Amino acid sequence: MQSGHYNRRQSRRQRISSNTTDSPRHTHGTRYRSTNWYTHPPQILSNSETLVAVQELLNSEMDQDSSSDASDDFPGYALHHSTYNGSEQNTSTSRHENRIFKLTEREANEEININTDAIDDEGEAEEGEAEEDAIDDEGEAEEGEAEEDAIDDEGEAEEGEAEEDAAEEDAIDDEGEAEEDAIDDEGEAEEDAIDDEGEAEEDYFSVSQVCSRDADEVYFTLDPEISYSTDLRIAKVMEPAVSKELNVSKRCVEPVTLTGSMLAHNGFDESWFAMRECTRREYITVQGLYDPIHLRYQFDTSRMTPPQILRTIPALPNMTLGELLLIFPIEFMAQPISIERILVEDVFLDRRASSKTHKYGPRWNSVYALPYNAGKMYVQHIPGFYDVSLRAVGQGTAIWHHMILSTAACAISNRISHGDGLGFLLDAAIRISANCIFLGRNDNFGVGDPCWLEDHLAGLPREAVPDVLQVTQLVLPNRGPTVAIMRGFFGALAYWPELRIAISEPSTSLVRYATGHMELAEWFLFSRTHSLKPQFTPTEREMLASFFTLYVTLGGGMLNWICRATAMYLAAPYHSRSAYIAVCESLPYYYIPVNSDLLCDLEVLLLGEVDLPTVCESYATIAHELTGYEAVRTAATNFMIEFADCYKESETDLMVSAYLGAVLLLQRVLGHANLLLLLLSGAALYGGCSIYIPRGILDAYNTLMLAASPLYAHQTLTSFWKDRDDAMQTLGIRPTTDVLPKEQDRIVQASPIEMNFRFVGLETIYPREQPIPSVDLAENLMQYRNEILGLDWKSVAMHLLRKY
């Protein structure tokens, strides 16, 4: 398995290095000024520690060495401009402060219009003005006419009307013949571009099939209408013109006996591995893919997001941008992204839905409202084999889309760039790591450390804590409207396609994989309750309480890992590697999900005695909730394995990709856990239902939300139900306690899930003869009136007066 990881990264590193040497060159700055940008234009900053502009730095380099061509000195670079106090240009700052964004061939491969890139190459080699005219024509003309116009301009400059007529004849040829004739006329530059990009685009945009290859280089064909399953993991993946769906391996194990845990300083001995000896089963499940070819003729594929601006982060005020990028090399993530790649990535996330229940799924870039039935909303449980009410599911999905996705998309799109999103994730990661250390136990750190419910955050030993993470009080979130938007909407940043693409593969696929399943589970959750009938069935309440406990434990394990990874990044060079062995070794994560013995114990204690296949068949909500939890556990574990493997191979770009991907997924996990608690609290307080949770899990949840407050803004019970009622009123949906009439009783069958969930071990470290005691949720919530319920001080005072 590790050889598969190694081969995949080796091939990627070789591909990037080979592509960088012969990447197409453009007139710097002109390419993005001449196009119609999809988002707001880049900002000009006044901070001398930020980036320098394209033309100013290029001119300064040309003045220093007039004998050399600027395009040879800076192949494929895009730069930004900074001034002192907004007036004086800064061209003498250090090389690290004037950070350069490299646009490698990997980004060039993501552009759809191949012939335009080839014309750019030839235009730069022959005449600088010809390239600028061709790029200007590309932004204004239709996609089908862009190649013809560019060739016409080139023909007028070189060979006149004769070559122009030949280009027009080539433009009307069929499919591959048109590109081959154009290659013969334009020369070797365009032929090289076609060799690099043409095959990936042709394979990916095939209407009838999508080709991929497995670890043994065996190609297999995926039909969009059929689901496939194979036991081979994708180990070496091509990077096509768009973000291609990577198959995520789920690490399932047979029952084993766990008898203890191990600290980091003890090392990995044979007895420790013997306790976790098991047979792993890895598989891939590929569902039907949407064919994105129709997007090619609806959107201008030449458009790109503007060049991104990276800033210093407030969490490290004494660190310059150059020093920050040396530690966290995220500049490759800030490259402009093609609009078509964004749209296709948005479609990939939507493909998780069932065609029977969701013919049209919500998307980030949706411009139309989802179809639903206005009027009364009936939320009773439908008994049967995956039976659900199509009316209720459509209404619940519309409410979810209105409250979370569409609101977040309107607040972020065209206002916040994915470069700002990367900066927010990095700043929040450092802040939550400091809070984890401040609130943690500061002892018993290491692999397999059982973070029990009352003390969920492990923290770090004092000798392993960097100076920048040693705080004497809780670190608060950064201020500003942009930060407030990115912290809200139940962790909606994972739905942002630009940000998922920016963190690069395989993190893009991991986040998409987990987010898609959690999204589908939330659609069904929103279809089961409203303010007049917030109750679930007893089975649903019991199972949702168990999943809430598991999500809190999983989120705490992810926060502990992020804290240790951040400390390793910021630690002084003299720190021993053994202090951070928990994030540098990948082997433990192959045996224990998230390397958390507590999580494995709780899975057995809460779900071990449940007949999961029968429950999932009778309750579609529980079925998708189980699938969502399994997907999140798999994705989080894969992030940790990827980080450790990249550390061994010294691949810093993939390390930081896995690091930020885990931070992004943690925000979505916190949002889903918040939503589960609000629904359970509504059933307990508003519906009068008895719900029991393990004692201490609500304390762990409150501590987790307090530590992760720079990353996620917790939503209270009162604000959630008020926002939900407002959304229903806006959509014209009325809550009712009536039973669904038979004439409107349209029952459909949701797609059955694959019962692939496995327990790590049927034996637990926690003594089975002493089960975890439970408490009533309604009584336990009274301890957190302000934090969870959202009651103001006047309401609390009135409650105390009535009580005493």
Curated annotation (Swiss-Prot):
Residues 117-203 are annotated as: 6 X 16 AA approximate tandem repeats. It is found in: Virion tegument; Host nucleus; Host cytoplasm. A motif (Nuclear localization signal) lies at residues 11-31. Residues 1-42, 58-206 are annotated as: Disordered. Pfam families: Herpes_UL47 (PF03362). Phosphorylated by US3. This phosphorylation is required for proper nuclear localization. Belongs to the alphaherpesvirinae HHV-1 UL47 family. Tegument protein that can bind to various RNA transcripts. Plays a role in the attenuation of selective viral and cellular mRNA degradation by modulating the activity of host shutoff RNase ORF17/VHS. Also plays a role in the primary envelopment of virions in the perinuclear space, probably by interacting with two nuclear egress proteins ORF24 and ORF27. Expressed in late in the infection. Interacts with US3 kinase. Interacts with ORF24 and ORF27; these interactions seem important for efficient virion nuclear egress. Interacts with ORF17/VHS. This is Tegument protein UL47 homolog. It comes from Varicella-zoster virus (strain Oka vaccine). The lineage of its organism: Viruses, Duplodnaviria, Heunggongvirae, Peploviricota, Herviviricetes.
